[in-house]
A protein has these predicted regions:
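Intrinsic disorder/low-complexity segments
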Residues: 161-162
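Anionic-ligand binding patches
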Residues: 1-151
Length: 162
C-alpha cells in the first residue's frame, strides 16, 4: 500500500530483469525492499490478488445472469471470481520454499513468510486457491466440473501457487 499499488500487475517484471525466474525473483525482491526503505511496518500492508473470469455466450444459464459478480461485454456474459490474500511486506527475506515474493510476504495473523509454508498449507490460503475454489463451487452448481478439478489451487508446473 505504501507504493500505491506497485508492483501490481507488473509484479513479475517489477525490476525490469529478464532471464531465468530465479534471477528476476531476486531482483524484484531487492527492488521492493529498496523502494519500501524505511517505511514503518504498519504501512507495509500488501495483498496478492487473483481474479478469474468465466465467460458464456449470449445464452448463458440463469445462474450466470443472477450472479452478484455478473457482467456483460460484447454480447458475452461473465462472472468474476476473486481471491485475495492479505498480509505485510517484511524488511528481509525469510524461508526457502515458494517463489516470487513469498520470502517477503507475511500473512495477516502469522509471523512466518509464505516461503516458510508447506505446499498444502499455502494452497489452502492462497489467493489463487481461493479464486479457483470459488470457480469450482460455482461450476458445481451448474452441474459442470473442470478437468483437473482435484488440483485446483496449484499450477501445472508442480510448484506452489503464491
Amino acid at each position: 500500500d505504501a507504493l500505491d499499488g506497485a508492483p501490481g500487475v507488473h509484479s513479475a517484471r517489477f525490476a525490469g530483469v529478464t532471464g531465468d525466474s530465479t534471477t528476476s525473483y531476486a531482483a524484484n525482491n531487492r527492488l521492493l525492499i529498496e523502494r519500501l526503505g524505511d517505511v514503518p511496518g504498519e504501512r507495509r500492508s500488501a495483498r496478492f490478488v487473483t481474479e478469474l473470469v468465466l465467460l458464456y455466450g449470449p445464452e448463458a444459464p440463469s445462474a450466470i445472469m443472477s450472479h452478484p459478480r455478473h457482467f456483460e461485454v460484447d454480447g458475452l456474459h461473465g462472472v468474476a471470481f476473486l481471491g485475495v490474500l492479505e498480509g505485510w511486506i517484511r524488511t528481509e527475506a525469510l524461508g526457502e520454499k515458494g517463489f516470487g515474493y513469498d520470502p517477503l510476504f507475511r500473512v495477516d495473523g502469522d509471523t512466518r513468510s509464505l516461503a516458510q509454508y508447506g505446499m498444502d498449507e499455502k494452497n489452502a490460503i492462497s489467493h489463487r486457491g481461493k479464486a479457483f475454489r470459488a470457480l469450482r463451487a460455482f461450476l458445481a452448481t451448474l452441474g459442470e466440473q473442470p478437468r483437473g478439478s482435484d488440483d485446483l489451487g496449484s499450477n501445472n508446473r508442480g510448484r506452489q501457487t503464491s
